[in-house]
Amino acid sequence: MARMKARSAKGKRVAKDTWKSKVWYDIYTPQSFGGDVIGQTPANDPANLIGRISEISLRDLTNEHSKHMTRMYFKVDGVSGNNATSQFVGHDTTREYLKSQVRRRRSKINAIVEVRTKDGFKVRVKALVLTAVRARDHHKTEIRVRMEQIIKEMAKETPFAEFVHAMLMGGLGSKIYGDCKKMFPLKRVEIFKSEVIEFGKAAEAPVEEAAAEEVVEEAAAETQE
């Protein structure tokens, strides 16, 4: 019995610590968003980084406390050394914040519209209008139609980076508010969510390690499938 136990112990495999082989990479926003570091992520192969999503609050990115409820998402699209580049792929707003804005005897009007920016990016935009008093159905319809028109017009006339800035920093919401308040008393406008569906011609080319260029491109293709 003792010999059998010794043999069993000798043949036992030791689990490999994969963390020791991992390297930490800094994730950077696109230059159009300041080129700032927004986080770190580990990987044992640069190709494994492609397609990873990094999240950061707009408050942390801009140092504006009033933007704490907005979360931005960036997808890694390239690697150079220990640095990973990324593309903005969308944003959302915390559910708690949106619920806190809804009051009794007010109407909530939602608009979901897909637009294409001046430089070819296709974006799905979700906007919300809260009226100051309860609105009738025909007022809701008129406001929703005008919301969609404003969003489409701004996207068509604006490059992607500027359009995203308008969504996140209030420019688009202010435009909707200014136009629609002439139709009915409003309380607030929120561009509460966006999603990039297609990248346009102005998308920044990812920077990749020369030695890993082919494998990184293959990983990117697999991610899109």
Curated annotation (Swiss-Prot):
HAMAP family: Ribosomal_eS1. Pfam families: Ribosomal_S3Ae. Belongs to the eukaryotic ribosomal protein eS1 family. This is Small ribosomal subunit protein eS1. GO terms for cellular component: ribonucleoprotein complex; ribosome. One of its GO terms (biological process) is translation. Keywords: Ribonucleoprotein, Ribosomal protein. The keyword Ribosomal protein applies. It comes from the Archaea. One of its GO terms (molecular function) is structural constituent of ribosome. Coiled coil: none annotated.
